[in-house]
């Protein structure tokens, strides 16, 4: 019974949470008011958690059950994407072909257009026939005057056009007597009476290259017409009739002394009639003008070249130039050449870039030593358009917008094909741009968490690994190409290094990390940079050049910190011996001084954990040697003077303080203690600093030597009131 109540409560709770008007705030408020105490709220919370777990399990179960369907759907989407890509290329090619057809060649339509017209009329006539004639590209001749398949409108095609007219129109046999006549356009029309705009009859118009045939419709015989009138285009005028509903889509034909008004099926067909009539009339007028000019041109007698009287001239000079004409012929009738443009379209659509470039190489090899007559030039123009499309696709493959997860090897396919197409420079530019985007993305995706040194390790690993992979892939892809590509790679590497240094400096120097942390981070970066030497690429000098300002700033900043700390200790100086209290503390100090390079520190220690030195001098020694060690890790030649001047400024603060105290102190015991500290500073610390600097830099520092020599003046004349500056 309790179980049943629990199930009903759970189902009721589920329905309540699933309702469209559920409001969490109102629900919690009502629940708090209705609950007796904490126990009811705990039980309700358990029910909600159980419902959440049940929902999660159901969700997992449904996802698992539909997992295979998800995979199939993703595969189908991939197939659909490929097919749409292929269809897009085919449509683009068809659009280019249609746009390349010159309208001026409309009147010179081929016989294939007439055959298409007859087929459209037999299929039902009317608008269907018109659309078929207008839509077929084979209806229009090519620029050379030939049809699409290469054959011109011969006598057989013209006869076939007139035969089609005879089969459909009664009483037009006399058209056979007109040679060179062919069909341009045809369609159904409705004739109206000119005065009262009353419908007269249905007619069919046949526009030919020199005349317009009007035939009336025979209702008893489907698809047949009777000859009505024939109007030469020379004396025919076409006038557009303004729409005046319900009379619309009309145009008028003026033939002196009569006129006729026809109505088209719709505005589109009316516009086609007007355009085709004007174009055909214009073409006929141009044709007859050329004929008149040719007829009027004077024809002089053929020039006969006198026979040369050169006795040394060979008889072969009089031979005809037939061999030269034969040399101009190139056999383009092979099937693979005829189908080459279409095959290239298929390869591009199917992303078979290698196959497309193989076809281009095959064609170039075939035409390598052959002349370039017009057919070859036409073929190359068609192929060049495909090369442009292929190049655009390959460029898109290398664009940064594409996925960058594949690494440098993912670009090898597109790069290699661009190189084969002779576009090595573009391939190099796109490859490096793609890798720059990949490196930038990888750096941005790094999470800044934890210690700075940990982030720098990750940053160096990601960047230098990407740079190394890019360099190796570049060497593989562009081996044997123009050496200018390698110069471009060096420029790119410097740009990428600038991107790395920006991220490096922002995390290390802008965040004001300690000098020891900065030194360790720079050391890690240098170690990774040296790995590039395995492939002959040394970018260490670029790292130095890009980091020099940041390191100078860090050295100046840390120098100011040491100087301020030293001045603060000097202001509280009491010139007392150090008491370390425990042997352990004394032993630790000895180890620290030994690590600083002070090997004779034992002579300054006394009994019972006493040290015969001031706390200020000991602290200064440790801080100065620590600064020098960390600075030497950052050292490179451009930082020589910065580091040296910083050391001199730090040492001068301590030297001037000891000098001033020695001159101002009146107590003999304290004065002796100050002299002991001065001796330690001048004879132990300064030589150690000078020696360590020379070891780290590789050459002695004259400024440090001059500073140590100047300190001797203090010991020679200790009663002087002049301070060393």
UniProtKB/Swiss-Prot annotation:
Source taxonomy: Eukaryota, Metazoa, Chordata, Craniata, Vertebrata
Function: Component of the exocyst complex involved in the docking of exocytic vesicles with fusion sites on the plasma membrane.
Spans annotated as Disordered: 116-159, 285-322
PROSITE patterns listed in its UniProt record: PH_DOMAIN
Gly residues biased stretches: 120-129
InterPro entries membership: Cullin_repeat-like_dom_sf, Exo84, Exo84_C, Exo84_C_1, Exo84_C_2, PH-like_dom_sf, PH_domain
Pfam family, one: Exo84_C
Name this polypeptide is given: Exocyst complex component 8
Family: Belongs to the EXO84 family.
Gene: EXOC8
Localization annotation: Cytoplasm; Cytoplasm, Perinuclear region; Cell projection, Growth cone; Cell projection
Species per Swiss-Prot/TrEMBL record: Bos taurus
GO (cellular component) term, any one: late endosome
Record bears the keyword Signal: no
Residues bearing PTM Phosphoserine: 19
